[in-house]
């Protein structure tokens, strides 16, 4: 980190001669030791900005302080309620003739992929998007020629009776923004590159005067656009991207959510200084965990500042297909469950009109949750970390003396996948083993990298069904857990099975009818009374908990009930692993299943709450449910079982056919778990936006590709025809390549 002066104090902290004070009533937590993450100088003494070990929020310490004295740090409010989904109150921002804010529906939008200079093609694309039901359409405007074309685009659409508001996407071009503000309804600016130079990822040092001069430069460059938007009644989005922060911001705050927030606040303060309030914020990242943290931190700051500006939600470079939908659902859905978000965009490497349907499904999910106003009884939340990730430590199964089978593999340390298996599947054991993604050797199953960890069998085969029982024995022998209801285990006992019990059965003592030492899995909803939850304290053989609320049930908010359950477990020192179990209704739409799982389970896993997932849907393919489960864990940055792709959705800047190239690269590299590859259409969303990708394939010029290792370019100007092979060779050169598995 650079040494200098903090550009602005944390808004919830007031420094006094006698120590530290807080400007509002807050909930406090004690911190005994605080590792500094940023050192800044001031005329009032030394200030350390650090991370609270219990809350994840920023805290401050002033010298002198007695050695070892605890700090009091605030737990910041970041949403209206932690007990239910209650939409955050935001002001109305007018985008053309469409109002945006909490008094209005969640707006949906996308972005064109055509060359903006091609007026006819862009108009056609906007019309297709509008016909699908989008509220806004964003168009890239990178230069004067594109800005001039925008006037013709707008006029042509109006002549065709398409009055959908148009948004100009601006990078590096303040003069272009001024021009297009005369015809488009909204201007998106990226604080990381609107006035600052392109990031070189350099460590910079600033004095107080240096930093102030940088802020004055930003104000000088940005103010004319603010005045132009006021003059023409335009809206604005101050849209920070995790991967395109300026060197100045990164030198102070790192490549972090805090840096994203501060970057946006610098621009917002200029807007407010000029009495311009028709703007929204966004905090996008390709990593859903980072994205969620940044939005929450921004809202916490707005609560402290008394601001009520709306939020545009999005996970940038989400990718394509179910992967892209899942990643978007985790990030956007988590925030919608918190009541945050006024407009959303699902960024997919697909035709832009294809983004509208998943976007609408997500918006409906958030609206439905807020309209129901269901939750749980108020409880005191002390342990969940809102602003940074630290996974709760669930105790994996330990081997007990005298046990004949190894239970240590029934759950995976990085996140577990459980699947529901039917009796019919036991009739074809080898097919079942393959469905569970087990590796077969002479017909015998063995666990592999992405093998299901445990299965739920609601009905056991008859004791005399030797073939079915042998199939189950072979699964138990490879440390795959077999969960079955207590009633089944009592009437048709399966050796070494894990009995599934509910709270009533625990209360009645029915589980004591099982042989001593039988392992248990307990199903809970999360809204049980504390007296019922106390039953967990007296049972020694609990291997895991299943948090299970039927999907679509309107009596309990799943996310909030789970948070209450985890708070109880942490408060009472109970470290049972918790599996998130969702049973979807029949005929559920696939996109609804992916989005529902991503939003409801992702909202917990991004906070480190949970140890695995069990998805059930009677009429969905077994392999689809299995793959969706693994995608969910990987999207939450837990268990990595396949290649991770950071793939931009394409826009008018894109220098090659992203969908075609992305498909080619995936076909040849999808078998590399632990490897992350960025596929970026241009340099604007290139090195910075690649975030933590290991390798990058980036459009550098028409027909030419640049290859990156991390954020460093290592090869330039490779012809498109050989670029994919060059990427593979680069992966090999860095020792990350393995040959694809041979089909049996």
Curated annotation (Swiss-Prot):
Compartment(s) of residence:
Plastid, Chloroplast stroma
Cite the entry's keywords alphabetically: 4Fe-4S, Chloroplast, Iron, Iron-sulfur, Isoprene biosynthesis, Metal-binding, Oxidoreductase, Plastid, Transit peptide
Q: Which reaction is catalysed here?
A: (2E)-4-hydroxy-3-methylbut-2-enyl diphosphate + 2 oxidized [2Fe-2S]-[ferredoxin] + H2O = 2-C-methyl-D-erythritol 2,4-cyclic diphosphate + 2 reduced [2Fe-2S]-[ferredoxin] + H(+)
> How is this protein annotated for GO cellular component?
chloroplast; chloroplast stroma
GO biological-process terms attached to the record: isopentenyl diphosphate biosynthetic process, methylerythritol 4-phosphate pathway; response to bacterium; systemic acquired resistance, salicylic acid mediated signaling pathway; terpenoid biosynthetic process
First and last residues of the transit peptide: 1-39
What EC number(s) is this enzyme filed under? Answer: 1.17.7.1
Q: Name one Pfam family in it.
A: GcpE
Cofactor requirements of the protein: [4Fe-4S] cluster
Establish whether keyword Oxidoreductase is in the entry: yes
Protein role? Enzyme of the plastid non-mevalonate pathway for isoprenoid biosynthesis that converts 2-C-methyl-D-erythritol 2,4-cyclodiphosphate (ME-2,4cPP) into 1-hydroxy-2-methyl-2-(E)-butenyl 4-diphosphate. Is essential for chloroplast development.
> Subunit details for this protein?
Homodimer.
Q: Which family does it belong to?
A: Belongs to the IspG family.
This chain's protein is named 4-hydroxy-3-methylbut-2-en-1-yl diphosphate synthase (ferredoxin), chloroplastic
Query: What organism is this sequence from?
Result: Oryza sativa subsp. japonica
Gene name, per UniProt, is: ISPG
């Amino acid at each position: 980190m650079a040494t200098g002066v903090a550009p602005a104090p944390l808004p919830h902290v007031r420094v006094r001669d006698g120590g530290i004070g807080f400007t509002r009533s807050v909930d406090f937590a004690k911190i005994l030791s605080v590792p500094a993450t940023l050192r800044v100088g001031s005329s009032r003494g030394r200030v350390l900005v650090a991370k609270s070990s219990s809350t994840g929020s920023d805290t401050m310490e002033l010298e002198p302080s007695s050695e070892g004295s605890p700090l009091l740090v605030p737990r910041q409010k970041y949403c209206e309620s932690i007990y239910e989904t209650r939409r955050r109150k935001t002001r109305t921002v007018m985008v053309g003739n469409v109002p945006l804010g909490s008094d209005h529906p969640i707006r949906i939008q996308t972005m064109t992929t055509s060359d903006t200079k091609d007026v006819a093609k862009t108009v056609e694309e906007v019309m297709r998007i509008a016909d699908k039901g989008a509220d806004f359409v964003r168009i890239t405007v990178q230069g004067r020629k594109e800005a001039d074309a925008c006037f013709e685009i707008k006029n042509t659409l109006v002549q065709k009776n398409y009055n959908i508001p148009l948004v100009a996407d601006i990078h590096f071009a303040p003069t272009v923004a001024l021009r297009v503000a005369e015809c488009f309804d909204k201007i998106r600016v990226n604080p990381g590159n609107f006035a600052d130079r392109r990031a070189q990822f350099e460590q910079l040092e600033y004095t107080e005067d240096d930093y102030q001069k940088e802020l004055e430069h930003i104000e000088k460059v940005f103010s004319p656009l603010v005045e132009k938007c006021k003059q023409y009644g335009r809206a604005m989005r101050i849209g920070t991207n995790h991967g395109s922060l300026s060197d100045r911001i990164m030198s102070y705050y790192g490549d972090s959510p805090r840096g994203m927030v501060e970057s946006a606040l610098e621009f917002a303060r200029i807007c407010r200084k000029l009495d311009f309030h028709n703007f929204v914020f966004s905090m996008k990242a390709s990593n859903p965990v980072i994205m969620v943290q940044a939005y929450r931190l921004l809202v916490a700051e707005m609560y402290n500042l008394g601001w009520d500006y709306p939020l545009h939600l999005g996970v940038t470079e989400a990718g394509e297909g179910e992967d892209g939908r899942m990643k978007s659902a985790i990030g956007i859905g988590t925030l919608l469950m918190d009541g945050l978000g006024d407009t959303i965009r699902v960024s997919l490497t697909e035709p832009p009109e294809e983004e509208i349907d998943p976007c609408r499904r997500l918006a409906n999910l958030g609206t439905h949750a807020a309209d129901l106003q269901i939750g749980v009884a108020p409880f005191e939340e002390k342990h969940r970390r809102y602003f940074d990730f630290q996974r709760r430590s669930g105790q994996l199964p330990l081997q007990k003396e005298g046990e004949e089978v190894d239970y240590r593999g029934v759950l995976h340390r990085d996140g577990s996948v459980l699947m529901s298996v039917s009796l019919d599947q036991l009739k074809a054991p080898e097919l079942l083993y393959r469905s569970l993604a087990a590796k077969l050797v002479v017909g015998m199953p063995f666990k592999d990298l992405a093998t299901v960890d445990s299965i739920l069998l609601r009905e056991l085969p008859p004791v005399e069904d030797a073939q079915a029982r042998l199939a189950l024995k072979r699964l138990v022998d490879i440390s795959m857990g077999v969960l079955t209801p207590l009633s089944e285990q009592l009437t048709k006992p399966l050796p070494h099975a894990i009995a599934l019990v509910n709270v009533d059965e625990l209360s009645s003592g029915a589980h004591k009818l099982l042989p001593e030492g039988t392992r248990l899995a307990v199903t809970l909803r999360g809204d049980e009374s504390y007296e019922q939850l106390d039953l967990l304290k007296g049972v020694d053989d609990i291997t895991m908990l299943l948090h299970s609320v039927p999907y679509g049930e309107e009596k309990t908010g799943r996310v909030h009930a789970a948070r209450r359950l985890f708070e109880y477990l942490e408060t009472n020192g109970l470290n049972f692993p918790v599996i998130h179990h969702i049973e979807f209704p029949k005929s559920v739409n696939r996109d609804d299943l992916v989005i529902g799982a991503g939003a409801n389970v992702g909202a917990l896993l991004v906070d480190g709450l949970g140890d695995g997932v069990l998805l059930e849907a009677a009429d969905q393919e077994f392999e689809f449910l299995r793959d969706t489960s693994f995608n969910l864990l990987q999207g939450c940055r837990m268990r990595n079982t396949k290649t991770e792709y950071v793939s931009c959705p394409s826009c008018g800047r894109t220098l090659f056919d992203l969908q075609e190239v992305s498909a080619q690269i995936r076909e040849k590299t999808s078998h590399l778990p632990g490897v992350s590859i960025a596929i970026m259409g241009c340099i604007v969303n290139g090195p910075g936006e690649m975030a933590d990708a290991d390798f990058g394939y980036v459009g550098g010029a028409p027909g030419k590709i640049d290859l990156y290792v991390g954020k460093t370019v290592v090869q330039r100007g490779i012809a498109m025809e050989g670029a994919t092979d060059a990427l593979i060779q680069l992966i090999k050169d860095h020792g990350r390549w393995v040959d694809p598995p041979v089909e049996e």
